[in-house]
Amino acid sequence: MNQTRVFLIFAWLMVAALLWMEWGKEKAAANAPGAAATQSVPAARDLDAATPSAANVPAAQAIPQAGAPGKVPATSTTTATPAAAGTAPVVTLTSDVLRLKLDGRSVLDAELLQFPQTKDGTAPVSLLTEDAAHPYNATSGWASEHSPVPGVGGFRAEQPGTTFELAKGQNTLVVPFVWNGPNGVSIRRTFTLERGRYAISIKDEVINKSAAPWNGYVFRKLSRVPTILSRGMTNPDSFSFNGATWYSPQAGYERRAFKDYMDDGGLNRQITGGWIALLQHHFFTAWIPQNDQASLYVLNKDGPRDVAELRGPAFTVAPGQTATTEARLWVGPKLVSLIAKEDVKGLDRVIDYSRFSIMAIIGQGLFWVLSHLHSFLHNWGWAIVGLVVLLRLVLYPLSSAQYKSSAKMRKFQPRLAQLKERYGDDRVKYQQATMELFKKEKINPMGGCLPLLIQMPIFFALYWVLVESVELRQAPWLGWIQDLTARDPHFILPALNIAIMWATQKLTPTPGIDPMQAKMMQFMPLVFGAMMAFVPSGLVLYWVVNGGLNLLIQWWMIRQHGEKPSKIIRANAK
């Protein structure tokens, strides 16, 4: 198979794959529930007010060891009898990476201080928000059938003031809240923020100084009115998955759109350990319970809101005893290094390099190489250039074999022409004779395909690495490229790509090429250039450097085999 045909196959496969991905985005947009836009949305601080209904709540468990957790409620419908409470003052907690606004029960707003919304240094990204149209909150509450529990506004900060900040030289910020219920029952909730960490530790201590056992269970939920994103290659935010995901040691990892969950009746599963999360481009929130903690995992819709929830464990706290439960709330970016430090099994799956496992593995490998190159070069753009150089070195033996195969094919073109003339329209005999010739002369007709076929999964895996990696978000290369995950604003790299592809065509021998193929080849640089104008500039940088190196290697190999590049260029110009 000659190089021209291989290139055409590769080109059309790329076009088809990109069109398929774009069609998938448009289809997802068409399937998005339009009714959500017309439903009334409550105020942001009311998002956590709804507690489960009073129906079918299991009775208090027989008292186990004092203070020990009981079983998780076996149904998805639960209740709460909150003690009367007013509106709690909003308290602000600030670390070096997070600024949180909370009332002790819900985190109402969370700003990611090291991630501005735009490159020009605007306000930081608000992952959790009180925005009236699209509120997004994280709540941790208590529910019970008979015992008093804190309602909205029930918790109060133990220390005076409404602003607490991680001081210089301090690595941990600890802020306790308390709810004092009737009859001597209280719950002490402690928020712990650490320097450089996006996981917030939340510890609850149920202290029973009453004369009767206290029964209840904790629920933790993420509640979001999703934003309907405009779909298209010019909107990177629409490329990434936006929905719910969860993981359990028993069932593994699952990621689906809320619509798919609702079509199947939602999620209602008892799990020990694991985690549940809401994902969006570059960022996510997640509730991470203790490894030995049993919870009821619930995914459902509450009007226009997507709700991901953990219910449990249930507690029976004997008089004079204390029960404790802890969890982590992740509010932050999909940073590989920081996620790994949490040591939570499966949490790295929130970084979605591909829905296909083999492509995800390739993507993880590419990012590993990129991150190590970045540690030396201190620039993600130059790390991409370094990755291309490494790949070309690894693939050089295949490229050399490809050119040798192509050169051998050109050598036998006159004999192939004789066979075609001999057998005329009898294609079966012509193919048989051709294969016998290849076998006799030890020619591999597929020799030119292998390097390109190997590059295809690398190319598409790198596409998803660039789209998904928050490390590259707003990362500059040089000059006009100030964000490698966004398109080239001046289309310089796509133009260079067109020029390099055109030069490669002129340097590629095409003896006996079909006239129709020749016309198609003339348009391929323009087709690729148009596609590259709307994909991340980091991907175009990869393709430009790869194409430039390939052009130089091809020039050198032509001379190594005793051919003259100028002669090939003149032959292609005819």
Swiss-Prot record:
GO cellular component: plasma membrane
GO molecular function: membrane insertase activity
Gene Ontology BP, a term: protein transport
Primary location recorded for the protein, binned into one broad class: membrane
Topology relative to the membrane: Multi-pass membrane protein
UniProt subunit comment: Interacts with the Sec translocase complex via SecD. Specifically interacts with transmembrane segments of nascent integral membrane proteins during membrane integration.
Its biological purpose: Required for the insertion and/or proper folding and/or complex formation of integral membrane proteins into the membrane. Involved in integration of membrane proteins that insert both dependently and independently of the Sec translocase complex, as well as at least some lipoproteins. Aids folding of multispanning membrane proteins.
Protein name from the UniProt record: Membrane protein insertase YidC
Species per Swiss-Prot/TrEMBL record: Xanthomonas oryzae pv. oryzae (strain PXO99A)
